[in-house]
């Protein structure tokens, strides 16, 4: 949970990421479930995991995906952190590169956990859905619906995620 604000925001945006480890793992299929600056953890747990911070555009996202296999994670359900957006921050000025990096992480996660490989069209729509940008055309909704069905079926077969949480 955190509150995001920026120079052109008429109001603050309250972000509520999942609070449970399983909910966080599911959220990782769609994006990073943490505000990096607000994270606390024991350094010993991190050192014992053997996970290394990778040098990529979405390094925090990849870090949490890697670390989620080694430790239990949670978000505190209170808005205790303010995240300020500004024009020149890396995630804004390098959005295209960061999006490509996040797409690669998501494709790898879908492949390793659910055995899914996305077509180029599915990948484009998946990204558009995750970023909540633009408007999907009517014909894209069919692809979107099919993609969601594939995600559900793949999880039903592999049981990688809690089915009750996965459908909510």
Question: What would you call each of these model-derived segments?
Answer:
Residues 11-108, 112-128:
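Conserved nucleotide-sugar donor-binding catalytic segment
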Residues 1-12:
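Conserved donor NDP-sugar-binding/catalytic core segment of glycosyltransferases
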Residues 126-156:
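Glycine-rich phosphate/pyrophosphate-binding loop
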Residues 157-162:
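Flexible helix-coil transition and linker loops at the boundaries of alpha-helical arrays
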Residues 166-167:
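Conserved small/polar residues in nucleotide/adenosyl-binding loops
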């Amino acid at each position: 949970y955190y509150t995001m604000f920026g120079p052109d925001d008429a109001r603050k945006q309250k972000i509520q990421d999942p609070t449970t480890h399983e909910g966080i793992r599911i959220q990782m299929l769609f994006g990073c479930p943490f505000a990096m600056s607000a994270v606390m953890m024991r350094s010993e747990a991190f050192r014992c995991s053997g996970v290394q911070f990778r040098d990529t555009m979405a390094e925090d996202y990849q870090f949490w995906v890697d670390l989620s296999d080694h430790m239990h994670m949670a978000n505190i359900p209170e808005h205790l952190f303010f995240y300020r957006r500004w024009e020149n921050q890396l995630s804004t000025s390098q959005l295209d590169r960061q999006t490509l990096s996040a797409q690669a992480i998501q494709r790898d996660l879908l492949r390793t956990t659910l055995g899914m490989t996305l077509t180029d069209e599915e990948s484009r729509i998946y990204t558009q859905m995750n970023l909540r940008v633009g408007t999907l055309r009517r014909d894209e909704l069919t692809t979107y619906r099919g993609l969601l069905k594939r995600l559900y079926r793949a999880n039903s077969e592999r049981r990688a995620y809690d089915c009750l949480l996965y459908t909510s």
